[in-house]
């Protein structure tokens, strides 16, 4: 990066530059060789000692006393003498000896900074740092050095900096820079600079414009920052600086910073002569003395950058600068006046020319405040003085005062007026469909004006509340700030048109008398030829009638607002002025309520929320897996909601509270180490589908085997009894009859035999009942004695990305991309003791590369005052304005309050214009359309290495290496090139949306992008709002038009939930810059280069023998819910690494201290019901066996710290039951097969 200087410091400031022999050219330097640092230090100490030991003379004290005594006499002297004394006192106050820090900086700055001048004035400074010369980009002018002025500078608008390579012969003058900035005090030209909380601050007044480019030094004389400007924060001023953080240059810009380059005079124009805008040539050029000439001069310079300086100078009427106050903010209104304009509804259902006509209603503030523009002026009296309690309105041709207390605003109910100034009113109103403004004049007559206006206070946050709470949460919002100071917002004003007034004419016999009443009147009569002119005294028109004349009052001493409800001055044309308006829209924070915490009940893979909303509150939740499955619902009354918690986790947001996160535990009601029904219940609650499938398959297999056994027995029986059935008179042997259950002719039924035994021989009856029980006991004993008939069935494949063992110090491993879960890896190297590395992701940031296409916001339609051409035809001129429309309408006959505006009936034309501009709210309320490209991934990793926990940050690209002590770590790239951002995204107020927006220059009316601009402050604007001018209504002066509604406001209503709530994998979306944080997707490979010195040889490590492991308790799928006791004997005292060689078991302790014969307790975490794992301590391994029980908590608020298994394992108890059941069924099948084989063999032998 070009803005990072290299360290080419030769210590010239503290010791002489090393001497080098020049071959031929001898360079003679005019500067004397500086002394060594020790000499400088001695001089400084001696100077400080002399200052400390010097006695303070008493004479100045007497002088001060005499001055105080003379002040009483000076008060009695003339004002002329006082003016002469004042400059002398100021000069004596300026003479102040620099402090120690200032002297030190001046000494260091002697070589390394150079003045930047423009037209002989110092506008800032350039500084030599490292191998670069650096100058703030906003400082205009050239460096006051012949060699540096010729350099080609590279400019960075991002850092507001220009830099170039230092000439070789000047490198010795450069200062060293550093990125080390511990909190404390630093030095600059004006004294001490405090660095705290990442900000540089100074006492207010210590810095000023012209200090831009000055360096800030540490106590070693190294540059830590370069000053660009400052922001006044009361007693302290926060500095805007460019500084360095390791290898990265950064810019610190506090809010409200002002550039500290010396302001250059801005020039204005008057009669082809330029002059400084702050010093008009007519000395003094004062509005009170020459109002018309002053307004004309301002109109000529309305597009000049120094227009407002010229306006202030014309109104101040003084060459001396005065302190600004609230009254001065109202001073600009002395050049304007209120006016009468057309109102569609004056309160009784009819239109009129109202003194409180509504011009514009602004509702961009998200806190619900309305900004209303009307035709009267508030806070100004008719004598142009300021008075908060008054307002002035136009009554006929004359402004009249009224009390401000009579002003009111109303929608569906009365509104609360929160601020007034000039033409503007701030009000907080309830929702409604119309807006009415009105006032009561001095004669107690009420004037109102009503407009259709749909008002609904916007929603801030996720709760629909009605009043601000005392306690809550601060959310960003926007409001109209209550300040009357000059802002960047402005309105256009122009000369008022001639106002027709037929009451000035009276008919006297055959003549017309015009009574001017102290006004300037323009008249035109069509009798005995053309008779027209401009008069200031009464005039009589002979041989004429009133109907043949037209009179209008003209006034060019004041401006009025450029309203579409009043005509444009026909003589002035497009001439106009501008004035600042109050109450700008600013970003702020609003306090919103926080909903009551819900009552939470945890169930198996479910969470139940009992909600108590005080007002309509939004509930939303999403899964933190691949498919977010986002849901939201407005809750208006008490309600109980049950939500399923997926294995990946659940995020629930209730109102304005912070999100709640839940993860399910593998909890069940059964146990994996109990009876068959408990085991079945255990697995059924964990994995119902798999359990049902396995049980169904096992049942089918058992049923098949039993059926097979029965079939073989039936076949053997049939083989045995068939020969006897075919032989006449054959008798079946008793034993065969018993085995084959053959019923003899004399045998009774089982019921008859049982009845007989019960009646005659009860002991035999009980013996017969014991036969099946004896058979069952015999079968069980056979199963116990039967060797294992089948091998253990494996129902799952334990998959894990656990530890890997390598035999080299170049180690590579893969860790899951899950934040907050520790991961351990074992590094084994022949001849060395094993080393355990523990790594834990603190955060993972995915930041896409963005390209800003445009910003869009709300537009405003500019409709200047229409140009009415009386008795003629007007023509449109092409103008390069966004969505510009111009139309000429013929046959108009407009009226003003004093009568018809034109003398002609049908030959009049009206030229209507309209175009679109960005609204004033675009500086705060806008959406940015970005194209997103390849994303970079950075990770913050905690590494436990050599007994220390160290946190490092690195780019996870597989190339960027970071050093942890003496080991080198290379992280990435991610296994999955996934991003939550689409190719096109929209950013609005800290929220990000995936949206396929229209490209630049292709916006459609009423949709997102109907107005487009490159930046909020740029002048290039594209607009397509379907603006169509319409014919004005007969008799009224207005500019009607049709236009599509704002696409930006429509998008705000329909935009839906942002990526903050809908992104998969639990991503947290942030802005400035746009990034996704902690997306749990994929794996991250890590390559580790460990030096030989980090390993411990086996001969140096303690030897551990006689190890035994006993698990005291174990709860699987819990946060280190297992505890094992390992007994050992160590050869010597030392430290041993502890590691689990089983993938599915994680041990919390990375290493332990061993000594002699002792025991240690280790905590482990596993997802296995029966954990069989090996623990390695130093180079010795021991086998551990654990019987784990399910956790008691169904839901927890942290992710699992162990390896998650897709399917649970089979416990040893379950396997024992499987073996028994399988062996029993197998034995039955084997016996049946044996019987069948014997029967078949006997049968075949007889034949």
From Swiss-Prot:
Site positions (Cleavage): 260-261, 324-325, 747-748, 808-809
Residues bearing carbohydrate: 272, 587, 949, 1078
Ranges facing Extracellular side: 325-691, 748-762, 809-1223
TM helices/strands, residue ranges: 692-712, 763-783, 788-808, 1224-1244
Interaction with spike glycoprotein E2, as annotated region: 154-159
UniProt PTM: Structural polyprotein: Specific enzymatic cleavages in vivo yield mature proteins. Capsid protein is auto-cleaved during polyprotein translation, unmasking a signal peptide at the N-terminus of the precursor of E3/E2. The remaining polyprotein is then targeted to the host endoplasmic reticulum, where host signal peptidase cleaves it into pE2, 6K and E1 proteins. pE2 is further processed to mature E3 and E2 by host furin in trans-Golgi vesicle.
Broad class of enzyme this protein falls into: hydrolase
Domain Peptidase S3 residues, every copy: 112-260
Record-linked Gene3D superfamilies: 1.10.287.2230, 2.60.40.350, Alphavirus E2 glycoprotein, A domain, Alphavirus E2 glycoprotein, domain B, Alphavirus E2 glycoprotein, domain C, Tick-borne Encephalitis virus Glycoprotein, domain 1, Trypsin-like serine proteases
An individual GO BP term: fusion of virus membrane with host endosome membrane
SUPFAM superfamilies given in the database record: E set domains, Trypsin-like serine proteases, Viral glycoprotein, central and dimerisation domains
GO terms of molecular function: serine-type endopeptidase activity; structural molecule activity
InterPro entries from the UniProt entry: Alpha_E1_glycop (IPR002548), Alpha_E2_glycop (IPR000936), Alpha_E3_glycop (IPR002533), Alphavir_E2_A (IPR042304), Alphavir_E2_B (IPR042305), Alphavir_E2_C (IPR042306), Flavivir/Alphavir_Ig-like_sf (IPR000336), Glycoprot_cen/dimer_sf (IPR036253)
Cysteines joined through disulfide linkages: 112-127, 268-277, 282-286, 285-317, 343-449, 346-352, 415-429, 477-590, 525-549, 527-544, 720-741, 857-922, 870-902, 871-904, 876-886, 1067-1079, 1109-1184, 1114-1188, 1136-1178
GO cellular component, one term: host cell cytoplasm
The keyword Transmembrane helix appears for this protein: yes
Ranges in the topological domain labelled Cytoplasmic: 713-747, 784-787, 1245-1247
Keyword presence, Glycoprotein: yes
Region entry Disordered, spans: 52-103
Enzyme Commission numbers on file: 3.4.21.90
Reactions accelerated catalytically: Autocatalytic release of the core protein from the N-terminus of the togavirus structural polyprotein by hydrolysis of a -Trp-|-Ser- bond
Note: Belongs to the Old World alphaviruses that usually cause fever, maculopapular rash, arthralgia and myalgia.
Protein name (database record): Structural polyprotein
Origin species: O'nyong-nyong virus (strain SG650) (ONNV)
């Amino acid at each position: 990066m070009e803005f990072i200087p290299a360290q080419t410091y030769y210590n010239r400031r503290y010791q002489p530059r090393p001497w080098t022999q020049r071959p031929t050219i001898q360079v003679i330097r005019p500067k004397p060789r500086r002394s060594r640092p020790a000499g400088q230090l001695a001089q400084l100490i001696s100077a400080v000692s002399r200052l400390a030991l010097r006695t303070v003379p008493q004479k100045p004290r007497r002088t001060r006393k005499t001055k105080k005594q003379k002040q009483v006499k000076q008060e009695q002297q003339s004002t002329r003498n006082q003016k002469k004394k004042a400059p002398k006192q100021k000069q004596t106050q300026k003479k102040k000896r620099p402090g120690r820090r200032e002297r030190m900086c001046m000494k260091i700055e002697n070589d390394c900074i150079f003045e930047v001048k423009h037209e002989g004035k110092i506008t800032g400074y350039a500084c030599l740092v490292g191998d670069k010369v650096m100058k703030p980009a906003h400082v205009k002018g050239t460096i006051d050095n012949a060699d540096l002025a010729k350099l080609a500078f590279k400019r960075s608008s991002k850092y507001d900096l220009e830099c170039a390579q230092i000439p070789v012969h000047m490198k010795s003058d450069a200062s060293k820079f550093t990125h080390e900035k511990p909190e404390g005090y630093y030095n600059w030209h004006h004294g001490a600079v405090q660095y705290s909380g990442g900000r540089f601050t100074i006492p207010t007044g210590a810095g000023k414009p012209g200090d831009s480019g000055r360096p800030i030094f540490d106590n070693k004389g190294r540059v830590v920052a370069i000053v660009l400007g400052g922001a006044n924060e009361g007693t302290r001023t926060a500095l805007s600086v460019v500084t360095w953080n390791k290898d990265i240059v950064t810019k610190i810009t506090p809010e409200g910073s002002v550039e500290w380059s010396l302001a250059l005079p801005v020039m204005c124009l008057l009669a082809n002569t330029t002059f400084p805008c702050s010093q008009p040539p007519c000395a003094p050029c004062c509005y009170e003395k020459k109002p018309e000439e002053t307004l004309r001069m301002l109109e000529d310079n309305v597009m000049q950058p120094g227009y407002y300086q010229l306006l202030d100078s014309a109104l101040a009427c003084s060459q001396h600068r005065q302190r600004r106050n609230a009254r001065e903010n109202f001073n600009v209104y002395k050049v304007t006046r209120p006016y009468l304009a057309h109102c569609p509804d004056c309160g009784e259902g009819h239109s009129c020319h109202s003194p409180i006509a509504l011009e514009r209603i602004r509702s961009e503030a998200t806190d619900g405040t309305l900004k209303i523009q009307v035709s009267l002026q508030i806070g100004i009296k008719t004598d142009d003085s300021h008075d908060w309690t008054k307002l002035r309105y136009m009554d006929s041709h004359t402004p009249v005062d009224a009390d401000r207390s009579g002003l009111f605003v109303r929608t569906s109910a009365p509104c609360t007026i929160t601020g007034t100034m000039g033409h503007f009113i701030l009000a907080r109103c309830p929702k409604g469909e119309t807006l009415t403004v009105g006032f009561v004049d001095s004669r107690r007559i009420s004037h109102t004006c009503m407009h259709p206006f749909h008002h609904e206070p916007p929603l801030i946050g996720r709760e629909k509340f009605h009043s601000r709470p005392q306690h809550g949460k601060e959310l960003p919002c926007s409001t109209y700030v209550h300040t009357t100071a000059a802002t960047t917002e402005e309105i256009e004003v122009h000369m008022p048109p001639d106002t027709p007034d037929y009451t000035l004419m009276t008919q006297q016999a055959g003549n017309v008398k015009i009574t001017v009443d102290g006004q300037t009147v323009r008249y035109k009569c069509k009798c005995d030829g053309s008779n027209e002119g401009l008069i200031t005294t009464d005039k009589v028109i002979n041989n004429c009638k009133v109907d043949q004349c037209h009179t209008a009052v003209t006034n060019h001493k004041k401006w009025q607002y450029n309203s579409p409800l009043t005509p444009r001055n026909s003589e002035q044309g497009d001439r106009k002025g501008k004035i600042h308006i109050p109450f700008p829209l600013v970003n702020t924070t609003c306090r919103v309520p926080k909903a009551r915490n819900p009552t939470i009940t945890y169930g198996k893979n479910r969470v139940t929320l009992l909600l108590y909303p005080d007002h309509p509150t939004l509930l939303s939740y999403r899964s933190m897996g691949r498919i977010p499955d986002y849901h939201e619902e407005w809750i208006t009354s008490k309600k109980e909601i049950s939500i399923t918690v997926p294995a990946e986790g659940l995020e629930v947001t209730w109102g304005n509270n912070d999100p709640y996160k839940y993860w399910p535990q593998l909890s069940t009601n059964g146990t994996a180490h109990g009876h068959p029904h408990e085991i079945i219940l255990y697995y059924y609650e964990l994995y119902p589908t798999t359990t049902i499938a396995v049980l169904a398959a096992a049942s089918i297999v058992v049923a098949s085997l039993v059926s097979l056994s029965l079939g073989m027995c039936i076949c053997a029986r049939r083989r045995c009894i068939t020969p006897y059935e075919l032989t006449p008179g054959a008798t079946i042997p008793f034993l065969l009859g018993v085995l084959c259950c053959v019923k003899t002719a004399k045998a009774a039924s089982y019921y008859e035999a049982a009845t007989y035994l019960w009646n005659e021989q009860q002991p035999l009856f009980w013996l017969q009942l014991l036969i099946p029980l004896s058979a069952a006991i015999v079968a069980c004993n056979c199963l116990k004695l039967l060797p294992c008939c089948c091998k253990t069935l494996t129902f799952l494949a334990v998959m894990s990305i656990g530890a890997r063992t390598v035999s080299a110090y170049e180690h590579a491993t893969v860790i899951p991309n899950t934040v907050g879960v520790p991961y351990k890896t074992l590094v084994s190297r022949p001849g060395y003791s094993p080393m355990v590395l523990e790594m834990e992701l603190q955060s993972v940031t995915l930041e896409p590369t963005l390209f800003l296409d445009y910003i869009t916001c709300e537009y405003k339609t500019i409709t200047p005052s229409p140009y009415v051409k009386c008795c003629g035809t007007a023509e449109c001129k092409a103008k390069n304005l966004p969505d510009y429309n111009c139309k000429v309408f013929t046959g108009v006959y407009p009226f003003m309050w004093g009568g018809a505006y034109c003398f002609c009936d049908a030959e009049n034309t009206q030229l209507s214009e309209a175009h679109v501009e960005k609204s004033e709210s675009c500086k705060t309320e806008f959406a940015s359309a970005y194209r997103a490209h390849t994303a970079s991934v950075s990770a913050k990793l905690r590494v436990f290495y050599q007994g220390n926990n160290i946190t490092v940050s690195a780019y996870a690209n597989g190339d960027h290496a970071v050093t942890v002590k003496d080991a080198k770590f290379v992280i990435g790239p991610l296994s999955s090139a996934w991003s939550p951002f689409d190719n096109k995204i929209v950013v609005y107020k800290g929220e990000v949306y995936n949206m396929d927006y229209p490209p630049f220059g292709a916006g459609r009316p009423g949709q997102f992008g109907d107005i487009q601009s490159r930046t909020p402050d740029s002048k290039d604007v594209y607009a397509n709002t379907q603006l169509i001018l319409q014919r004005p209504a007969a008799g009224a002066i207005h500019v009607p038009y049709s236009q599509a509604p704002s696409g930006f406001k429509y998008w705000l209503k329909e935009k839906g939930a942002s990526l903050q709530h809908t992104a998969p994998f639990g991503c947290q979306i942030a802005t400035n810059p746009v990034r996704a944080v902690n997306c749990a997707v994929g794996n991250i490979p890590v390559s580790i280069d460990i030096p030989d010195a980090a390993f411990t040889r086996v001969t140096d490590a303690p030897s551990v023998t006689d190890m035994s492991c006993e698990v005291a308790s174990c709860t699987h799928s819990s946060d280190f819910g297992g505890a094992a006791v390992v007994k050992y004997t160590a050869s010597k005292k030392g430290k041993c690494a502890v590691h689990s060689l089983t993938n599915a078991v994680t041990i919390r302790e990375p290493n332990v201290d061993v000594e002699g014969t002792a025991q240690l307790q280790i905590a482990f975490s596993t997802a296995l019901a029966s954990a069989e794992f090996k623990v390695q301590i130093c180079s010795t391994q021991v086998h551990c066996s654990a019987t784990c029980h399910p956790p008691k908590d169904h839901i927890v608020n942290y992710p699992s710290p162990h390896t998650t298994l897709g399917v649970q394992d089979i416990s040893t108890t379950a396997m024992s039951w499987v073996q028994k059941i399988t062996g029993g069924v197998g034995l039955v099948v084997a016996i049946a097969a044996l019987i069948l084989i014997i029967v078949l063999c006997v049968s075949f032998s007889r034949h």
